Amino acid sequence: MRHLDYTEQENWRQPDDTAYQSPIDIATQSVQPQETGKFAISFQDEVQYDDREIGEQFLVHGQLRLDDQIWELERFHFHDGAEHLVNGQRHDVETHFVFQHGDQTLVVASFGDVSANEKTGAVKNIYDNQVNAATLLRLLPDNHSYFHYVGSLTTPPLRHDIQWLVLTEPVAISAEDKAVLHDHYPDNYREIQEINERVITYYNDKN
């Protein structure tokens, strides 16, 4: 499968695309506090591989309970090099979990950084089809604090009105995990987009 060429991403935008694009650089000193927004995610064990032009996708059933609303998990995928920045800093990896609620889309973004102490990699297990719900939970931090904003998908079509939950704490990944992602689809991250006066909120899971 021929994947999107990220060296040509300046050609992805269409005239009618929203001005509120993703990803963005999140300046923590500018975020506003968010009082509610506690969530829980559950996964089922079976994962199906699906290679698409936008990159390799992993189809899996699961749910996100956000306050009193249920979102259904459609798929997840990886980015070799995080798409979102935090205070100008890029994490090693970003995982996107794509959820649906009717015609609405929400993406949970989870960062990963290589750790010398992490020897067995969840990412490699997923590509080796050695995966269950416990493996997928390793892609999420225990602390569910996050930044929230409204943006777009980061691959064409750049659909608008996407709810983004960008988790603040990275998970540890192995060097082998990072190498697997780089071998499959190197540097597949979109350039940072203008914030354009959007409001970014912060939910503290520890409160």
Show where each model-derived region lies.
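Alpha-carbonic anhydrase
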Residues: 1-207
